[in-house]
Amino acid sequence: FRVELLAGLCVSWGLYNMDFDDLIKEAQRRTTSPNGVYSAKIMWSSFQDVLIERLKPRDSSDPSGSSDSSQFPSSSLCLSILKAHFPDPRFLWIRRRNKVAQAISLYRASFSNVFHHRRQRKKNEKDPPPYDFTKIESKLQFIEECESQWQKFFSENRLEPLILYYEDFCESLEDTLLIILKYLGERAAERGIPKITPNLLKMADSTSKEWELRFRKEREGN
């Protein structure tokens, strides 16, 4: 639900002058699986700044009792807005144990504007940005804040998301998919999962590892 990705979808689908609500419906129509499953990846920043703000009815009242329209809606209102557009939502919360490595990846991706690399495409060989402790620390704080906000959203709505760790599905994608299918109640889980070749490649490299060691040493020294 990043704005630039949504704009790209509109162009690729040949859709113009479509409001956000209709775009969501069109995305569901085009990408829902034959057995009725629709999935979307939502980062907290997109959840806050794009999805909820654009889908929130202008005259909606906040169940928390807050009347300040300048404040981000309460967790209960956010959930009710989601349910109005995505009935019976199930939440898969993807986290990362090594948040320093995640912060380094985010810093590098933000600098190059390359957030993923597909197996079928030639790798973008842009030079990495210069090492910057302050900027990596800023990304780390951003990641921790986003995770804190998701935790608040789930806790206040008494939701129990399926928690998945990046490191685990990198180790065994098939095992992770089985866990997801069982969580969703899909019978395909009973038949097992064949070996899968991921479409996306890991972008971390030796530079990422060197930076992590350097960052941890500098952080311990502060």
Question: Which sequence ranges carry the predicted segments?
Answer:
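PAPS-dependent sulfotransferase catalytic domain
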Residues: S39-I163, E171-E190
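PAPS-dependent sulfotransferase catalytic core
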Residues: F1-G36, P63-S66, K122-E137, D168, I196-S206, ...
